[in-house]
Amino acid sequence: MRLCDTDIERHLDEGKIVIEPRPGVERISGVSVDVLLGNEFRVFRDHTAPYIDLSGPNSEMADAIDRVMSDEIHIPDGEAFYLHPGQLALAVTYESVTLPADIVGWLDGRSSLARLGLMVHVTAHRIDPGWSGRIVLEFYNGGKLPLALRPKMKIGALNFEMLSGPAARPYNKRENAKYKSQQGAVASRINQD
């Protein structure tokens, strides 16, 4: 069952869902909570690796990812990160989100931004039960013009669903959880699969 706005507010009040800093009621509507863009970004360096073999040895994948990913870029409040057409970048939500073992979250992009070519998550939009941390955004500009992205702009919306029961293996209890408690724009850790 998807949670409505009053259920979301109740879960926030009870501490079952934690969003820090807590959004005001003006950012909770219908079935979702608007989330804001954080200050941390990562981009791909051009021409630093000929390819990444996604089924190759883990050490080779890790080395290739380290070569192609930039260090984290911090954009101060009020300044902009420019995402150019055809560019993929990682960013992070301003808020940190914590979910219990019986709720799954879903991140949706904003239609107004998509109409300008901005994809907020290339594929990964599920927020696992037991998740705690900031949410990494996989931006892609499919439009014709560069897009200026500013920290604390509305970037997406989270909605939540109750599971039929608590997950037996929530994210925070899994030993192999690659992105547990992430706070920045963490690069791919596919080599840890």
From Swiss-Prot:
Pathway: Pyrimidine metabolism; dUMP biosynthesis; dUMP from dCTP (dUTP route): step 1/2
Keyword terms of this UniProt record: Hydrolase, Nucleotide metabolism, Nucleotide-binding
Ligand binding (dCTP): R110, S111, S112, L113, A114, R115, D128, V136, L137, E138, Y171, K178, Q182
Enzyme class: hydrolase
E.C. numbers: 3.5.4.13
Catalytic reaction equation(s): dCTP + H2O + H(+) = dUTP + NH4(+)
Family: Belongs to the dCTP deaminase family.
Protein name listed in UniProt: dCTP deaminase
Record organism: Aeromonas salmonicida (strain A449)
Lineage: Bacteria, Pseudomonadati, Pseudomonadota, Gammaproteobacteria, Aeromonadales
Recorded name of the encoding gene: dcd
